[in-house]
Amino acid sequence: MKRIILILVVLIVGIEFSNAQQLPQFTQYMYNTIAVNPAYAGSRDALSIVALNRNQWAGFDGGPETQTLSIHSPLRNEKLGLGLSLINDKAGFENFTYAYVDFSYTIQASADVEVSFGLKGGMTYYKLAEELYNYTEVNQDAYFDERLNRWNANFGAGILVHSDKWYVGLSIPKIINHDMNNSTDYAALETVHYYALGGYVFDLSKSLKLKLSFRVKYTKGAPISNDFTANLLYNEKVWLGGSYRINGKQRAIGAIVDFQVSDQFRVGYTYEIPTGEIRPYTSGSHEILLMYEFKFMKAKQKSPRYF
């Protein structure tokens, strides 16, 4: 009985993530695609640096917290792209850190369409928080005699087809299944995830554009997660929009604002409200995105990048 109670304490705030949802959730996925699809590396024709911080379920003790940092650029050979993806994801007492290198190869399918193929490889570090071991029940339980922290290697692949106005992609960012704890009593699984994403930009007028986008995430043992976003772009400077997520019985509605501060720098903010059972316990989720691009390849850019 003590073992059952202890495991529930460890998992209660992050049970959705512990068994099959290790890859973190974020709303501004259209600008951070490289985190889940290596084919995106170098697609913006610039050295692109993107940092994101997400505080999910603010006010809920042990709620998920996610930070990502991605750097990617085309190489001298325009067909090749190279990138680095770093992710830190914490939920309850569990913490996952990902460090992956991304490589892409692009072919010209037609005058307006490019097809990119990508590979991703790196390491995942799994850790239980040190404060967990401050509990007397933990120190007295032989199950926790051996610290459950460890590194595991993994790799992934993806494809991205895009033009100046639309894109669609498929990816498997982690192909190898890992049981982080080698235990049948407490399974923290790094499982295979499948992603599909896409979007289209409509010209409403000379100064106004509408971008519709989606992302679908699936992994065995968890509900399919569906993200839908709609954003209006005014004068190539300001994005205003909304998002809607369906994840099993959970729902979330969000508002998005994004400013193109300069040709090189942009900042975005998302506020989400869950509509499920957790709603009374949180003030919502906050997500901040910063992007900076060194456009030393500006002459090669065919048009503004909307994703």
Task: Indicate where each model-derived feature is located.
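Short, basic/polar N-terminal leader/transit segment immediately after the initiator methionine
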Residues: 3-6, 22-24
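Subset of outer-membrane beta-barrel
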Residues: 21-307
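Sec/Tat signal peptide C-region and signal peptidase I cleavage site
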Residues: 15-20
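Sec-dependent N-terminal signal peptides
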Residues: 4-14
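Positively charged n-region of N-terminal signal peptides that target proteins for export
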Residues: 1-4, 109-111
